Amino acid sequence: MKRSEINRILKSSEDFFTSQNWRLPVWGYWTWDEWLARSALELDEILTQEMGWDITDFALGDFERKGMVLFTVRNGSTPATGYDKPYCEKLMIVNDGQLCLTHFHWDKVEDIINRGGGTLNLRLNNANADESLDMANPVVVYIDGIRRVLDPGAVLSLAPGESVTLPQRNYHSF
């Protein structure tokens, strides 16, 4: 992606967060010079845990169709990293017509919360022991604490304000 495209997406993302009354941590607004003025020790958790902006087209060169914007506020980790947080918090922007590629997390339980902007559609499958898509067994998730059993590969739609808890090894794309 070209730097000019990344800068345009960053500005648009900041505007969207503002329109939804979301504020980033103070370091989410720092200039390059403000980052450089900080010590590595002061920034260790942010850098080690890969927190902050992530604008990706998944190396496919088609951001408008296969891409997304993330701002990682907290990132789950194991005690070995020195930052024992078995959870993460990420603000994500997926535009109409965009797709976040299918993936799962080995160790993290994930809450996906639609904070606003439109309906979020997720396709859900379990992972088999060999990490292939399980097309045979139902998917159990909790939507705002309410247990739902879905067919494998079902599309779950979340309206603004709704959330879903995805267990470990749950394939999802949105």
PLM region spans:
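Active-site glycine-rich loop that binds ribose-phosphate moieties when present
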Residues: V140-S157
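Short, solvent-exposed cationic patches
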Residues: W22, L122-N126, D151
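Histidine-centered active-site/metal-ligand motif
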Residues: Y83, H103-H105, H172
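Glycine- and acidic-residue-biased ligand/ion/polar-headgroup-sensing regions
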Residues: G67, N95-D96, K108-E110, N114-D144
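Conserved metal-binding segment of the jelly-roll/cupin
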Residues: N95, P152-F174
